[in-house]
From Swiss-Prot:
NAD(+) binds at residues 76-89, 282-294. This is 3-isopropylmalate dehydrogenase. It is found in: Cytoplasm. Its cofactor is Mg(2+); Mn(2+). HAMAP family: LeuB_type1. Substrate binds at R96, R106, R134, D224. It catalyses: (2R,3S)-3-isopropylmalate + NAD(+) = 4-methyl-2-oxopentanoate + CO2 + NADH.
Amino acid sequence: MSKQILILPGDGIGPEIMAEAVKVLTRIDTQHTLGVTLVYDELGGAAYDKYGSPLADETLERARAADAVLLGAVGGPQWDTIDPALRPERGLLKIRSQLGLFANLRPALLYPQLADASTLKPEVVSGLDLLILRELTGGIYFGQPRGTRTLDNGERQAYDTLPYSESEIRRIAKAGFEMARLRGKKLCSVDKANVLASSQLWRAVVEEVAKDYPDIALSHMYVDNAAMQLVRAPKQFDVIVTDNMFGDILSDQASMLTGSIGMLPSASLDANSKGMYEPCHGSAPDIAGQGIANPLATILSVAMMLRYTFAQAAAADAIEAAVGKVLDQGLRTADIWSEGTTKVGTAAMGDAVVAAL
């Protein structure tokens, strides 16, 4: 059965890292007879330059028609001065919303070979393996009303709205419990229920959903405490479920526990596990075109795609094992390099993963 994947290289280092991910995907397709068809288009700044919009209508239709979307990265300083509604990031928000991608999965897994890359002591992070599940289409990033107004005294005031409906909370909570069931059977719901009305409803609905999952140990934590605990004792967590803004912040924080955001993939899924897959890192315009970016997060995003959307666990395992082999060989891109290891570029790292498959 043919599987159509929409490839969106994006901006900055996006095209470079995507080229390596496609190399790996092509090889694994041959080895496991997946029947993959690749379709290419643009998103973000590259789409603005080509279509005059960060997400063209025809691109959105291609995304809807595809079984999965693989994205590089979006954004760059050359688009900082354009209409805010046309900024690259708006294309990313729109495609997530239009495809109904409400669940963002961001693992923070520390490879043993990279234990020294973390800024925390090895005993604090060794064996780290947690998953942050972020609600992606609701909350303050999409809430209305929002804007800037001038008060009677002439002062400007900006305002945003943080709404969450019961159904939005229920579906992400259910996803959190399901993910915990596949892992260590622990779920920590992070909110700010001591201050925010939306968080009070969040906590109440999560408690209601918990009744259907008696085998899962549920805990609640305020977001400020969660940020502190991620640094103090991150291994206490298995799955964290939280809202859009809190998840945005905490997942970036958790990514650095591993030493390099260049190692971390992510998945954004709809109710049927159709998804968009992308590295956690940004477009890194400062190193774009130099051939030194780390492609491993994008390659590992391919593994997540095979696991969650296509249910090809063996193929996903093979990619993850190949990445481990390459790290065992001492190959490192600049962001994860240390004394005694071999520094390689983007293409060489991709080739090494292909060779290890």
